[in-house]
């Protein structure tokens, strides 16, 4: 492939804006890197575990969760269960650290006690938030221009007047991606 008379090398893995994109459309390398970074930051939090619960909660959200959340809506819906559980395990270890809970404490109880959401639910909410910003013109015009045009010519009395025309796609990966269908 050529661009501006220069040959573009084909690669199997490319890091773009901190996100690893693979030619096979899997996110293994991305999850490996996210877990590695999050675990490093979690180990730093362990050294200050004597701070109050509120302080540890804020530190977790600033350091560890920000690493997990970066680009999460982009790939979360296409993750394998094993990859998603790796992210959930990082959050579970952080919840045990923040609360001082014992080893076999229920993940759901810890999340409920702290007011945290599961990684999957957080991804869905972040994705909805991003889509709302795009839809309500709170993003740059370039991003808004990538969205399909609303179907203005709808003559029927339906709840979704002015809704988006769905993309035509054939793959399961695209169907589960961030983009609305």
What are these regions (language model features)?
Residues 1-181:
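Hydrophobic/basic alpha-helical segments
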